[in-house]
Amino acid sequence: MHEVALSVLILLAGLSALDANDPEDKNSPFYYDWHSLRVGGLICAGTPCALGIIILLSGKCKCKFSQKPSHRPGDAPPLITPGSAHDC
């Protein structure tokens, strides 16, 4: 019984492969122009990347490294002072 079922499945798979559309059929709704899609994706990704690099290098966006940080770990007051902890 397994041999018959396996042969029927192989036959059905083979028949569907014989009836498949030509991959170069440009009238098919499942035909995609992969080259144009790739070029369009590179343009859509490269434009914001180049724009970001231009903005960073233009000097309009200045990072202020000379300022002192607002919070230094050495200046923080201690959270637990002697006598403030209670035994419950």
Curated annotation (Swiss-Prot):
Keywords of the record: Cell membrane, Glutathionylation, Ion transport, Membrane, Potassium, Potassium transport, Signal, Sodium, Sodium transport, Sodium/potassium transport, Transmembrane, Transmembrane helix, Transport
One BP annotation, GO: sodium ion transport
Highest taxon of the lineage: Eukaryota
InterPro entries assigned: FXYD_motif (IPR047297), Ion-transport_regulator_FXYD (IPR000272)
Protein topology in the membrane: Single-pass type I membrane protein
Cytoplasmic membrane side: 60-88
GO MF term list: sodium channel regulator activity
Ranges per topology, Extracellular: 18-38
Positions in coiled-coil regions: none
PTM (free text): Glutathionylated.
Cell membrane as UniProt keyword: yes
Spans annotated as Disordered: 66-88
Bilayer-spanning residue ranges: 39-59
Gene Ontology CC terms: plasma membrane
Signal peptide: 1-17
The protein's name in its UniProt record: FXYD domain-containing ion transport regulator 3
Organism: Sus scrofa
Gene: FXYD3
